[in-house]
A protein has these predicted regions:
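OB-fold and OB-like single-stranded nucleic-acid-recognition modules
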Residues: 22-153
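Bacterial N-terminal signal peptides
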Residues: 7-17
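Positively charged n-region of N-terminal signal peptides that target proteins for export
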Residues: 1-5
Length: 153
């Protein structure tokens, strides 16, 4: 009985702190904090929706699992989405939308990339990426690729 209570208090405190310190691009929260909460199967979807506020900036290292390119199909500029699907459960997909398509298109699967981005949306859908479960995704926009670390370096 004590362990679930302590876990709930810790998750609640972390969610509250993340909301209080929602900030600007120059003071991002650690992406690892987002990932820990978002992939924690004991945290409800409602708690995630409330605690992981859209508009919050995060920065951290991801592992590239795919990159997709989107052409200018109207008034918008072309962009690329860097995908990271390397989380426990396998049903979590982080999408990082970047305007620097040249850097994004140079990435290879397995590259480690330090990114900074603003949480835009979290949700759930059935996708082609995971057939055994519904994929929970988080979309980050206005992302910057800060550093690329190739495997083995």
């Amino acid at each position: 009985m004590r362990i679930p209570f302590v876990a709930a208090v810790l998750v609640g405190s972390t969610l509250f702190a993340a909301g209080v310190f929602a900030q600007d691009r120059s003071h991002p929260l650690p992406l690892g904090t987002f990932v820990d909460i978002y992939t924690d199967q004991s945290v409800t979807s409602a708690q995630k929706e409330i605690g992981l506020k859209e508009g919050t900036w995060y920065e951290g290292t991801i592992t590239v699992t795919d990159v997709e390119y989107y052409k200018n199909t109207g008034t918008g500029e072309p962009f690329a989405e860097i995908k990271d699907m390397n989380y426990r459960g396998g049903c979590y997909l982080l999408l990082f939308r970047v305007q620097d398509t040249a850097k994004a298109l140079a990435l290879k699967v397995g590259d480690k990339v330090v990114v900074r981005g603003m949480l835009s949306n979290i949700g759930m859908q059935t996708t082609k990426y995971v057939l055994v479960c519904e994929t929970r995704y988080a979309l980050f926009k206005e992302c910057e690729i800060l550093e690329i670390v190739k495997p083995g370096k």
